[in-house]
Structure formats: C-alpha cells, structure tokens
Amino acid sequence: MAKRSLASLNAGDLSGKRVLVRVDFNVPLNDTGAITDDTRIRAALPTINDLIGKGAKVILSAHFGRPKGQVNDAMRLTPVAARLSELLGKPVAKTDSCIGPDAEAKVGAMANGDVVLLENVRFFAEEEKNEAGFAEKLAGLAEVYVNDAFGAAHRAHASTEGVTKFLKPSVAGFLMEKELQYLQGAVDEPKRPLAAIVGGSKVSSKIGVLDTLIDKCDKVLIGGGMIFTFYKARGLSVGKSLVEEDKLELAKELEAKAKANGVQLLLPTDVVLADNFAPDANSQTADINAIPDGWMGLDIGPDSIKVFQEALADCQTVIWNGPMGVFEFDKFATGTNSIATTLADLSGKGCCTIIGGGDSVAAVEKAGLAEKMSHISTGGGASLELLEGKVLPGVAALDAA
C-alpha cells in the first residue's frame, strides 16, 4: 500500500510546526570518535532541508550503536551533531537526553527553521521494547512525524512505530520514499528481464530473499561463500571452503524450485582458491569440479565473471545484494569489482540497477562506482526484508497516501 510522503505537506501545513524526524545516523566512528563515513547523514539532508525551507522546527531522533538501554558516553550523538551542522551550514543543538526537561527546554526555545538533534534514543530500554509511555513522551515534543530512517524500518521500536499512534500526520521522508519506490517497485512491477545477484558467505542469512527472488526473477545469480553449500549439495568436493552442513537439503530445494519455475539459476563455473584465509594467501583458479583438498574458495573465477556478464547483458532491472567474494582482500576482490563495473555499464544503457544494502554498498563505494547506480539502498536488514516481501513495521505505521 502506498504511503503518504513529505511531498504532500506544504509550507502552510508545516510552518511553525514541531516535526519529529526519525533519521538513520548510525555512522561508523574511528578510535578517536571521528566519523569515517557520513553517507547516512548526507542521505537525510533532502528531507531536513525541505522542512527547514517550509519553516518547520526540525527535531531529529536517531539511534547509535547498541547501548542496551543505558547511557553510554561513547555512543552519544555529539560528533553527528557537529557534522550535520557543517553539512547544513547552521547550528544544530543537541539535547542531553531524548526526553525530559533538557529536550523540552531546547525544543521550546526553537525558532522556525531551527534544528535540534535528540540524544541517542537507545539510551532508554523502552525504545526497543516499543513501550507506549515512552513513545508518547517522545511524540509529545512534536506535532508531525516524518520517518526517513529506512535502515531501521524493519524494527517496531518506539521511535519508528510507537510514536505514530500519537502524531498525525505521520509520513515518509524523501529517502524512505525513494527506498520504497525502488526496492518495492523492483519486486512488484519490474522492467524485465529482472535479475538478482545474491552473494555473501551464508545461505542461512539469505534463505528468505533467495526463496522470494526465485518466485519473482527471470534470472538469479549466486556468488560468495554460500556457493559451496550448493556445490556440496550437488555432491562436489569443496576442499576446506565454508559449508553450512545443515542447509544442504535447502540448497537442493532452491535449485529444484528455480528449475520448476523456469528461472535461470546460475552458480559460478570456476573459483579463485586460497590456501588460508589471509590477504597474502597463495592462490589458484580451479574449475568447480576440481577443487583440491586443503584449499578454500574466496572469489568467483574469470570464466564465471564472463558467464555472469553474458546473463546480465539483456536485463532491464538488476538487484544486487552481497559480494561475490572476500572483497576486503584485494587479491580476492576481482569478482565483486567486475560485477560492480558491469552494473555501472548497464546503468549507462538504461538498466535499473539497485544495490540492496549491506556489503555490496561498501563494495560499490570502494570501487568508486556508487554514482553510476540507479539506487543504493541505505538499509541492510530492512532491504532484505522488503525484498523478501515482508511488511516493515516502520512503513506500515505511516499514513496511507
């Protein structure tokens, strides 16, 4: 069901109004507490700037890390407020706590167009328990709710779901709207042929998404460590590669389902092997039918890259979730980088390319190709759950369009 968006609210609706905006500012920090990647902060700027422009009082709510319901000084949002202030070119006040006297005082002192960042909502255990009393206090700071935190939309927490019971309208921000448009659109109404590339080390974490994609796609390409569970299920020798022994039957079922559905399910034909799990390991390329004992597969091989490129050539929509190998090690990054380059080229030819969150986003950014893709999802678990066809609580709670 389509959701009401911030675009439906004009300056007349928002000027002078206190607007609670749930954002995803869970950014990586280094040892000195400096932000190493501000992508998530930048991703929220269109929504924040739109609200400032419409004269709203912008109250931002976010979580950071996993403080387990207790105040943890290392997980305060102080560096985030400083970076956001630089990006907006205006001061951003930060509260000492997300509810209580300090938050009320700082919100009460706001002028139209001001921005306040509430302290980490997860300092309260009630946030993750979606406790109604806590949600009501948080909502009590505002009059309108905007959810722009797609990365947290698969959680029914107080700041993503509970507050909507006390604030109307409750609408999707621009980032949330774009995520839903691309990810839901790709699964529900794709331009075909539709291909999905699924990587990563474990079948167990991608079962739901593989199962759904085999129902929806024309082609499914599988890479990453999970391929060895499929090979072992076929009776092949995989050396000391990663295998989930308890998922062998499932791998057989997924292959059988693809065949029954007339879906092209492609696994690599060759792999790059290492003698141990290290960036400087000795390596060799082998056909999947000839993996020697004592070696482990850490990337897809050159022949597989060609096969995958040929399969993708005529596709109009491609969803990619999960790397082809251990791309963190340069020696085993070729498969992942080649797929990234292929998708960038396809984008240039009018194919809709969607990078579905998680490690594939890091891989595309590392390859310097992020700008070339149609859409890069900011969600990890949320992207997977949406692609699985699950209802996300943070989305379901918003007003209907």
Swiss-Prot record:
Entry binding sites for ATP: 206, 297, 328, 357-360
Pathway the protein takes part in: Carbohydrate degradation; glycolysis; pyruvate from D-glyceraldehyde 3-phosphate: step 2/5
Stretch forming the signal peptide: none
Top-rank lineage group of the source organism: Bacteria
Compartments reported by the entry: Cytoplasm
KW Zinc (keyword) present: no
CDD domains: Phosphoglycerate_kinase (cd00318)
Enzyme class: transferase
GO cellular component: cytosol
PANTHER family: PHOSPHOGLYCERATE KINASE (PTHR11406), PHOSPHOGLYCERATE KINASE 1, CHLOROPLASTIC-RELATED (PTHR11406:SF23)
Subunit structure, as described in the record: Monomer.
Family: Belongs to the phosphoglycerate kinase family.
Protein name as it appears in the record: Phosphoglycerate kinase
